[in-house]
Every structure is written in C-alpha cells, then in structure tokens.
Curated annotation (Swiss-Prot):
Gene that encodes the chain: NOP13
Residue list for modification Phosphothreonine: T105
InterPro entries (alphabetical): Nop13/Rnp24_RRM1, Nop13/Rnp24_RRM2, Nucleotide-bd_a/b_plait_sf, RBD_domain_sf, RRM_dom
GO biological process, one term: eukaryotic translation initiation factor 4F complex assembly
Broad class of where this protein is predominantly found: nucleus
PROSITE patterns on file: RRM (PS50102)
Organism classification: Eukaryota, Fungi, Dikarya, Ascomycota, Saccharomycotina
Positions of the UniProt region annotated as Disordered: 1-43, 72-116, 313-403
GO MF annotation terms: ribosomal small subunit binding; RNA binding; RNA strand annealing activity; RNA strand-exchange activity
N-acetylserine: residues bearing it: S2
Protein name, entry field: Nucleolar protein 13
CDD domains (UniProt xref): RRM1_Nop13p_fungi, RRM2_Nop13p_fungi
C-alpha cells in the first residue's frame, strides 16, 4: 500500500473515533471514559453540594444560614428553589392521581383508608400475654384458650381458632442450640370484646410450668417512664449529680449557670484533658443537699446544654460509703509462742527492780522453711552438717586396671 492510502485510512479512523466519543458523551446511560474530554462552562453557577441539599431537605439549616457561612452564588439558590417547587408540584399531582384511582377502581374497598380501618378493627380487641415459658408455642396457647373458654355460658365469649385474628409471638435462636424459642411474651387479637374479657380473666393461669400474666394490649402500666430520670437512676438518691454527654467546649461556669436554679452548688468536678484542659464529656456536680440533684433530674429545661441532650443520674456519695473492716488472721495453733515459765520465761531480777519482764521467744513452735514441694530446703537441712575438706587427698598406691 502507498503512503497516500495509509494517510486516508488514518483520517477515516480518526473521524470514526470522534463520532463515537460524541455519541458516548451525549448518551446518559453510558459511563464516560477517562480518555474523553470534559467541557466546563466557567460562567455557569456553582450548584449546591449534596451535603448542603441534604441539610436543607431535613430542615436543619436555612438558605440564609448557608449563604452567610459559605457565600453561595445567588443563581444557585434560585435554581435550588425552582427544583424544590417542581418536586412539590410533581408530588401533589401524583397524590391527586392516586386519590382518583382509588375512587375509580372497582375494588376500592380493599385499598387505601378502608384497608387501614380493617387492620385497626383486627387489632382492636387484643391482649398481651407475658411470663411464658420459652418452650411454649402458638399451638399451645390456642389449644389452652379454646379448652378454657369452651364451657362458658355466653357463646360470644367462647374462643375458636377462627376467632383469633392475629397471634404475634417474637422468637429468637437459643444460645446453646439452633432451636428457635419465644422471648417470653406474645400478642393475641380476637373478633369481639367478650372473647378478650374472657381471656383476661384467665390471668395467672398455669401453662408449661409458668403462671401467665395477661393484660390488655393497650395497657402500658408497669413500664418505667422514660421522662422520670429519678426512677431510672441506677444509684440511690444523693446530693451528687452525674452529667454525661457534655460537649468538649463546656466549662465550669457554664454548668454552674445551667444548674444554679436547682439548688446551692458546693463544687463542680469536671474531667478534663491534661494537654488542652477541655472537658472529657462528663462531670459531677455536688449540691448542698439531695433536693438540688432531684430538682435537676425533674427539670426538663436542664436536659440540654449547648444543643446536646444530657445523660443525668444520681452519683455515688463517698461519704455514705460503708468501709469494710479487715478480719484479723487468727493463728490455728492455740499454744502461745511465748515461754513464760518461772525458770526460762523472764528474768526475776528485773521484775524485782520494778522493770518489765523480758520475754524470750521460743523456737519450738516455729515451722521449718519449706519449698514448693513441701520439702525442707537444702540450705536448712545441711546447716549443721560438717563441712568437707577441700585439701588434696594423698595417694594410697592403689591403681585399678581394666583388662
């Protein structure tokens, strides 16, 4: 092939490559290769970042606050507002179409609000059953209530399998095996009030070794109140208040101002870092009496500081801590370790002069030093042995020969 023909083929291939690149750039479904060039319009406005849009969508920040912090281009703010309006209008149109479809559909009774009402009716007459044995199954409960209510005089209060609209029993895997066991409670729903009342009367009945506790499913009595921090506190009431989840920028003065209306504050003990001196995230506030710490736990205005929810509870009062006394070791041997006999115990001459008698400790009751194998140490056993001579032994003229 000649050089002219080769140059023509190269020109054709270049044109084909350029056309393919243009098509790839225009096609939104295909990914752009690293070789492809990107054209950037420097005059166009800078759009908001994903983080900024997310904060605006959740309502945590306003456009004015973002503009004051980042100095956003006004064109990008207008574009964001237009996009938000378009999304709202599109959502409203979809809702309107959805309402029309539910009205026009022939099976509209089974959709929308009608289905919700049916579910509410099904879950209206329910009971909560607690203190169940972990081996109890749904069939055990159904058989138990059917057998207990079949002899009731009122037919409406008799329970059958068809009358139980829903039975929810949460289950988890056992620790030592793969078998599934219930969590100790379940919910059971019936068709009418009479059946629910008949089952409620069976509370404290015996099933699988446990006395069942049956309550109305909407009766939440007995649960700890999350807002009652006094009852939720692990420690007994004291004048010390523990405050956790503090910001690192919190100071003693800020804490004192925040809790000063609760009572007289004696001192504030805040854990701080050695290098920066900032708060580690928790502190102890010592009030003059228990009323101050109790008021702080009850006051809802004290539960937030610097925009952070606080974790508060009673602290441990060390002044009320009971110190355990150490029990003195009593020797097993009842015999005295002192010899106070008239002959060996003490010097009578010293006693006659008015001075204190001198006691001599006897070594008879002492235990010999013993090693880990309960054997007397070699240094002690050979202490009284005669020391061998290290001199040269003279020859006796005897020579042993081996054949």
């Amino acid at each position: 092939m000649s050089e002219t023909e080769l140059s023509k083929e190269d020109a054709v291939t270049k044109k084909d490559n350029e056309e393919q690149v243009k098509k790839a750039l225009l096609d939104p479904t295909k990914k752009r290769k690293a070789e492809d060039e990107i054209e950037i319009d420097l005059k166009s406005s800078i759009p908001l970042s994903k983080k900024q849009k997310r904060l605006l969508r959740r309502g945590k920040v306003t456009l004015e606050e973002l503009n004051a912090k980042y100095n956003i281009d006004p064109k990008s703010i207008e574009e964001y507002k237009e996009d938000a309006e378009k999304k709202k209008s599109g959502a409203s149109e979809k809702d309107a179409q959805g309402e029309e479809s539910t009205i026009n559909t022939p099976t509209g009774d089974e959709s929308g609000e009608v289905v919700k009402k049916k579910k509410k009716d099904e879950n209206k007459y329910g009971v909560w059953i607690g203190n169940l044995s972990f081996d109890t199954t749904k069939d055990d409960l159904v058989r138990f209530f059917i057998a207990k209510t079949k002899d009731n005089e009122d037919e409406k209060s008799r329970v059958t399998e068809q009358d139980i609209t829903r039975l929810s029993m949460p289950r988890v895997a056992a620790k030592n095996s793969n078998a599934m066991k219930n969590k100790g409670f379940c919910y059971m729903f019936f068709k009418n009030v009479e059946q629910m009342k008949a089952v409620l009367e069976l509370s404290e009945s015996h099933l699988n070794g446990r006395n069942m506790l049956i309550k109305d499913s909407e009766n939440y009595s007995g649960r700890p109140d999350k807002d009652d921090l006094v009852a939720m506190s692990k420690n007994p009431p004291s004048r010390i208040l523990f405050v956790g989840n503090l910001s690192f920028d919190v100071t003693d003065d800020l804490l004192r101002k925040h809790f000063q209306h609760c009572g007289d504050i004696v001192k504030i003990r805040m854990a701080t870092f050695e290098d920066s001196g900032k708060c580690k995230g928790f502190a102890f506030i010592d009030f003059k009496n228990e009323e101050g710490s109790t008021n702080a736990l009850k006051d809802k205005s004290c539960r937030k500081i610097a925009g952070r929810p606080l974790r508060m509870e009673y602290g441990e009062d060390r002044s009320k801590r009971q110190v355990r006394k150490k029990v003195e070791n009593v020797s097993r041997n009842n015999s005295s370790s002192f010899d106070i006999s008239n002959n060996k115990g003490y010097d009578r001459a010293g006693q006659d002069n008015g001075s204190k008698p001198e006691y001599k400790r006897s070594n008879a009751n002492r235990r010999p030093p013993v090693d880990s194998n309960n054997r007397t140490k070699s240094s002690v056993a050979l202490a009284t042995a005669q020391r061998g001579s290290a001199a040269i032994v003279p020859s006796q003229g005897k020579k042993v020969k081996f054949d």
